[in-house]
């Protein structure tokens, strides 16, 4: 089963180019994070903007926002001298835009508009889980804007069938908490980690939108490493059931000249709230090397 089948499963009980005139509005007052908005076609994307330096864009996981899960990571990159942009998916926080019949190309255009408007037209893109899918597609469509990508907890190119549908349980807020918690512990958190912290933060409408976009896009295997010119860092949680150990070396074997692998111990698919410091230590040296080239 190919990786894309994770996103092609039925979504039970859940409901192409950058706009040449992408514009920015003024920051909101008294918001939790420094915030600006970027126009992308019919969408108005809220972006959390922190730091200064080479630009890094963070794309969150399936059906979730790019807020609290990435605060420690963002603060660490800001302290290291980076401008960190966290565009919020349509339907999360105050990002707005069409939510039906949305394509991955349109979501990638949102990313590109943010890079053009706030990031000096070039950025390293870090995707987490579903965000790795969008990072890869964005780099294929906009290789001149995205010279390097980090794919954190990307899942394998083949998935265990009993795991592939778990996001549609954890993200279905109409289900009993006990059912969702079992799915979270099984698929997203390593043993002895508290899965309760991810009971909140899900957006069923966003999950449905992203699912439909990936379903329409189809298989990703033809550009598993993003654009042919992109440098790739793959960060694999050692306990991630979405990427069994037999799948750990697929990316580096396919792209030995441009892919690097790091494994994070005692972490599963959620990764960032589980092992924040280890994630920073795995990514930052590679990020420093890549950012020195742009």
Put a short name on every predicted segment.
Residues 133-140, 146-175:
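Flexible "cap/lid" loop of the alpha/beta hydrolase fold
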Residues 258-294:
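Catalytic active-site module of serine/aspartate enzymes centered on a nucleophile-bearing elbow/loop
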Residues 62, 238-241, 266-268:
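Acidic beta-to-alpha connecting loop that harbors the catalytic carboxylate
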Residues 211-254, 260:
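Conserved serine/cysteine hydrolase catalytic core
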Residues 160-166, 173-228:
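Conserved alpha/beta-hydrolase catalytic His-Asp/Glu region
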Residues 43-94:
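Conserved HGGG/HGGXW glycine-rich cap/lid loop of the alpha/beta-hydrolase fold
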Residues 2-56, 79-82, 288-294:
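Alpha/beta-hydrolase fold catalytic core
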Residues 79, 86-126:
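Active-site loop/oxyanion-hole signature of alpha/beta-hydrolase fold enzymes
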């Amino acid at each position: 089963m190919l990786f894309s089948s994770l996103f092609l499963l039925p979504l039970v009980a859940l409901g192409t180019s950058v706009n040449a005139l992408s514009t920015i509005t003024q920051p909101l007052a008294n918001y939790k994070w420094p915030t600006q908005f970027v126009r992308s076609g019919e969408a108005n994307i809220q972006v959390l903007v922190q730091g200064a330096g080479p630009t890094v864009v963070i794309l969150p996981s399936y059906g979730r926002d790019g807020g609290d899960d990435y605060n420690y990571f963002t603060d660490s990159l800001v302290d290291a001298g980076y401008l960190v942009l966290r565009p919020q998916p349509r339907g999360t926080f105050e990002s707005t835009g069409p939510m039906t019949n949305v394509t991955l190309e349109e979501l990638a255009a949102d990313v590109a508009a943010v890079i053009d408007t706030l990031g000096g037209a070039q950025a390293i893109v870090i995707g987490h889980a579903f965000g790795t899918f969008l990072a890869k597609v964005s780099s294929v469509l906009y290789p001149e804007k995205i010279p390097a990508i980090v794919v954190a907890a990307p899942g394998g190119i083949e998935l265990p069938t009993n795991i592939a549908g778990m996001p549609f349980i954890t993200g279905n807020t109409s289900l009993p908490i006990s059912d969702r918690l079992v799915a979270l512990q099984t698929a997203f958190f390593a043993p002895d980690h508290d899965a309760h912290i991810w009971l909140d933060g899900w957006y069923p409408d966003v999950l449905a939108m992203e699912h439909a976009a990936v379903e329409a896009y189809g298989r990703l295997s033809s550009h598993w490493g993003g654009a042919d010119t992109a440098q790739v860092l793959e960060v694999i949680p050692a306990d991630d059931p979405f990427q069994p150990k037999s799948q750990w070396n697929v990316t580096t074997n396919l792209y030995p000249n441009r892919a690097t692998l790091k494994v994070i111990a005692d972490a599963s698919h959620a990764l960032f709230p589980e092992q924040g410091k280890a994630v920073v230590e795995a990514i930052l040296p590679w990020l420093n090397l890549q950012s020195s080239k742009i």
